[in-house]
């Protein structure tokens, strides 16, 4: 087994920088205006609203990842970009991806793209699980790092809401960093999340049952459910609840956990959803050891505490870290929390695209002001 190191991240950004055209490189038809500091660009991949390249940082002599985001034509992309920048420029934790630098033009009117510079990670858990089975040691270490990062996120009063294998970045020394905070929210049990299900369909498999049954009342336990799904996937190399649609997803969950008890049904505040569940024929639960016959017994014990139908009975992140399965890594003195909880309003659903653009511009400006080195 490889030696596990903790990668110290050098955060030495220059902030928002005006980028002249002469400092541009073209990667697969996309212009990257990130010179002269960032050179030798190489394609990594692309998502819905941006391309990612690796580059040499001439200031730190490190290889970094640069994400080019062109969000301003779409409301949703603007919202996600703003959330990501707002959160990640304030978070500082070994198991959460950092923002080292942000580049954009100096004029808001001319701002078409934003370049976000981050720590370079070689792969992600989704890709890793496609290619190899993990040893129990690797599963244990990855799970510990996920929960260590999540403890920090939850201590900041933030829900990630989109934890899944492709949002867990890995490097060669098995360091893990949580990324993609585009769907994150302040933890507010009264917030109505009705638009969430339509906002991002691809992550249905990792959604807690209460998300599909209630429009509000979400707590930090929705992220714990997602971590449970990820642990199950690490144990078997396949998703535990691969629902094809909303009802199929629910049936997959009930097919494993069994029918919810009368007590558990009480946590469903949507009467229609509760009546539907009560109308279903009784289903027994499937023992975890039958589903995962080769898994460590302690891993399955923790899995059962995370994949609990009732969110009020689901294990909180602090207790999960203290579980005997993670005993070899557990160190409360080295599991930092956020210095202050988030008080910034991230509910930007009703803000116009132009206003979102202004807020993104302002956030990049604030980031520059917080940097120790403000030299251009």
Curated annotation (Swiss-Prot):
The modification Phosphothreonine is found at residue 198. Disruption phenotype: Embryonic wound healing defects. RNAi-mediated knockdown in the prothoracic gland (PG) delays the onset of pupariation by prolonging the L3 larval stage and increases adult weight. Belongs to the protein kinase superfamily. CMGC Ser/Thr protein kinase family. MAP kinase subfamily. A motif (TXY) lies at residues 198-200. Dually phosphorylated on Thr-198 and Tyr-200, which activates the enzyme. Phosphorylated on tyrosine residue(s) in response to insulin. CDD domains: STKc_ERK1_2_like. The TXY motif contains the threonine and tyrosine residues whose phosphorylation activates the MAP kinases. The modification Phosphotyrosine is found at residue 200. In third instar larvae, expressed in eye imaginal disks. In adults, expressed in head and body. This is Mitogen-activated protein kinase ERK-A. Keywords: ATP-binding, Cell cycle, Cytoplasm, Kinase, Nucleotide-binding, Nucleus, Phosphoprotein, Serine/threonine-protein kinase, Transferase. ATP binds at residues 44-52, 67. It comes from Drosophila melanogaster (Fruit fly).
């Amino acid at each position: 087994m490889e030696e596990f190191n903790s990668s110290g991240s050098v955060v030495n950004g220059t902030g928002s920088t005006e980028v002249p055209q002469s400092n541009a490189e073209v990667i697969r038809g996309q212009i990257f205006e990130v010179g002269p500091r960032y050179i030798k660009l190489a394609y990594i991949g692309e998502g819905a609203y941006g391309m990612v390249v690796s580059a040499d940082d001439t200031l730190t002599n490190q290889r970094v990842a640069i994400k080019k985001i062109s969000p301003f034509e779409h409301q949703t992309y603007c919202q996600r970009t703003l959330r990501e920048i707002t959160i990640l420029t304030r978070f500082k934790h070994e198991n959460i991806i950092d923002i080292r630098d942000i580049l954009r033009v100096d004029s808001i009117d001319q701002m078409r793209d934003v370049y976000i510079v981050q720590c370079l990670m070689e792969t992600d858990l989704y890709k890793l699980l496609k290619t190899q089975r993990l040893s129990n040691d690797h599963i244990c270490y990855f799970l510990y790092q996920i929960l260590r990062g999540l403890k920090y996120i939850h201590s900041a009063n933030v829900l990630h809401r989109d934890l899944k294998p492709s949002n867990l970045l890995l490097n060669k020394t098995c360091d893990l960093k949580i990324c993609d905070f585009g769907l994150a929210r302040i933890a507010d049990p009264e917030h109505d999340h009705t638009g969430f299900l339509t906002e991002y369909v691809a992550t249905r498999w990792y959604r807690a049952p209460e998300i599909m049954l209630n429009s509000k009342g979400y707590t930090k336990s929705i992220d714990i459910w997602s971590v449970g799904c990820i642990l199950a996937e690490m144990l078997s190399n396949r998703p535990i609840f691969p629902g094809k649609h909303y009802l199929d997803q629910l049936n997959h969950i009930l097919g494993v956990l069994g029918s919810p008890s009368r007590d558990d049904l009480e946590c469903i505040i949507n009467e229609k959803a509760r009546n539907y569940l009560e109308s279903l024929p009784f289903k027994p639960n499937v023992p975890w050891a039958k589903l995962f016959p080769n898994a460590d017994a302690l891993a399955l014990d923790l899995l059962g505490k995370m994949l609990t139908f009732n969110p009020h009975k689901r294990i909180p992140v602090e207790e999960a870290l203290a579980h005997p399965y993670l005993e070899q890594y557990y160190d409360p003195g080295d599991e930092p929390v956020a210095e202050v909880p988030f008080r910034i309003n991230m509910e930007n659903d009703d803000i116009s695209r132009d206003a979102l653009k202004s807020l993104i511009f302002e956030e990049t400006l604030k980031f520059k002001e917080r940097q120790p080195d403000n030299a251009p």
